[in-house]
Structures are given as structure tokens and as C-alpha cells.
């Protein structure tokens, strides 16, 4: 099953997440099909907190991909801001 979820990157105590399309059987930070955005929970000042390619996310959801709870919340916030 294809899913859209967060993959953790960054340093210890400084998380940075990539929003990726991946097979649900792959490891959290393992192989992915496509990167569709990022989420920086500790962005400050002029740093961009979230960037999502909503067109590609809609494409994958149309093909049957499931979306994780956290990514769904990020999509909802991005749609509200746009």
C-alpha cells in the first residue's frame, strides 16, 4: 500500500521532516517513491516552516495513496493558508 508520511531528518534534538510518498512496508527513513514537500517544526524568523506540492499529493491520493494523520493536518493547514 502506498502512503504519504513524514521521514525524519536533521540532527539530534533538531528534527526536520521530508514529506514522502512511499510503500508502507518500507522503513520510516528508507526508500521512497517521491518527495512532495518538507516540514520544519522548529523554523524561526524568516525560515519557511512547510512546503507541500499539493498537486502531486492530490495525484497520489487519486491513485489510492493513504495519508498519515500528521500529513493530513499539514495539508489542511496549507489549504487554509492558501
Curated annotation (Swiss-Prot):
Species of origin: Klebsiella pneumoniae (strain 342)
PANTHER family according to UniProt: 30S RIBOSOMAL PROTEIN S16, SMALL RIBOSOMAL SUBUNIT PROTEIN BS16M
Keyword Ribosomal protein: yes
GO annotation terms (biological process): translation
Family: Belongs to the bacterial ribosomal protein bS16 family.
Name this polypeptide is given: Small ribosomal subunit protein bS16
Gene Ontology cellular component annotations, sorted alphabetically: cytoplasm; small ribosomal subunit
Top-level taxonomic group: Bacteria
One example GO MF annotation: structural constituent of ribosome
Keyword terms: Ribonucleoprotein, Ribosomal protein
Database matches in InterPro entries: Ribosomal_bS16, Ribosomal_bS16_CS, Ribosomal_bS16_dom_sf
Matches recorded under NCBIfam families: S16
Amino acid at each position: 500500500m502506498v502512503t504519504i508520511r513524514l521521514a525524519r531528518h536533521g540532527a539530534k534534538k533538531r528534527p526536520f521532516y521530508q514529506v514522502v510518498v512511499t510503500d508502507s512496508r518500507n522503513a520510516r527513513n528508507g526508500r521512497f517513491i517521491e518527495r512532495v514537500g518538507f516540514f520544519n517544526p522548529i523554523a524561526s524568523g524568516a525560515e519557511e516552516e512547510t512546503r507541500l506540492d499539493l498537486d502531486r499529493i492530490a495525484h497520489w491520493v487519486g491513485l489510492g495513496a493513504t495519508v498519515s494523520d500528521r500529513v493530513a493536518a499539514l495539508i489542511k493547514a496549507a489549504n487554509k493558508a492558501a
